[in-house]
Amino acid sequence: MTKKPAAKAAEEKMIVGIDLGTSRSAISASNGKRNWVDSYVGWPKDFIARKVVGKSLLVGKDALEHRLSLDLYRPLKNGVIKEGTARDEEAVKELIHHLITLVQSKK
């Protein structure tokens, strides 16, 4: 097993700042990328909805566009997880994951 040189390992680290908001969430990264999305997360209501939207999860604008086919969550209220249910927590995790993928460098 080979170890990466310390300088190379430091280059691969990325510092991010995330602002989870009730209506919009934003991210800014040390690689210079910035982005924001509407704070909506949606899961298809059933198998037919899954076929219509073509994904198992939609975030932001995509979720709003397909809101009739989705169980739509707006998981934050006043900067806090809204109800504290498992689905709200999962929605926040998915929202954060989506934000991070928006600023990651494509290799």
Feature map (PLM): residue ranges:
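Conserved phosphate-binding loops in N-terminal lobes of ATP-dependent enzymes
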Residues: 22-107
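Short glycine-aspartate micro-motif
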Residues: 15-19
